[in-house]
Amino acid sequence: VRRRAAEAVLDGTWDGGNGEPAGKPQADLVSMARPLLADPEFVNRAARGLNAEINHCIACNQACLDHTFGNQRATCLVNPRAAYETELELLPAQGTKKIGVIGGGVAGLFAAESLALRGHDVTIFEAADTLGGQFNLAMRVPGKEEFVQALYAVVNRLEGLKVNISTGKAVTPEELQADGFEEVVVATGVRPRIPEFPGVAEGLEGTIDGVTVATYAELISGKKAPGDYVAVIGAGGIGYDVAEFLLEDRQGEPQSLTSWNSQWGVVEDSDVHGNLSSPKPERPQRRV
């Protein structure tokens, strides 16, 4: 590309080279900022060919840029030790313990990793069939497909640390005690907050005058199907994500290049100045 282009060519990526073998660089210069907050070992892992273990930046800006703009210490949503390394030290444990982590969401996975790095014998118990918790919902939202890479990376690291993983069954206190667990970490996650509006509780069990009532988790997971005209109660981050999901409804599949180009007015015809034309956004499937 460089030999044919008069301008500099830039790219944004969050992994260690899209699987390219170490020692075969495809770029003249690599510049990183946020990815090094997410994983200070980024370069070392990439050099050793451990791209699948790189802790991925999900470009959320919530703990790095947002904190910086608020005159707070910058850290990282997927690496809470970022900028706290001298305070949250992962020192070798003086005695190995058998520890159970209840919940295989993001908090449980990272807690298990920290404990295993200190030398403990760790088992994760997840009642659902898959690990990831809320990340499994977030990665279905258009624009957040990259979240899946962060989830895969921590699971790969846990496998390397020989962390035991049990899914598809809730564990009881009696079972934990019988199996000799010395410590238990509770990381069971969150549930959608149900507003105390008249009829909402009843609607979640069925419908209200033919209108479906659903939580964000039920909609995004596909447990309930949305209609053609949807009201979203709540305008925070989750409400916005739900609206995006409902308008595109791609079920977390990456958008095709052809569709993206059309939506943003990018054309491949080199005779067009700047390779731009009038954008042609796709018509939303429903009103929100």
Q: What would you call each of these model-derived segments?
A:
Residues 28, 182, 228:
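Conserved acidic residues
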Residues 98, 227-229, 287:
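Residues that mark the start of a beta-strand
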Residues 101-167, 235-288:
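Beta1-alpha1 glycine-rich phosphate/pyrophosphate-binding loop at the start
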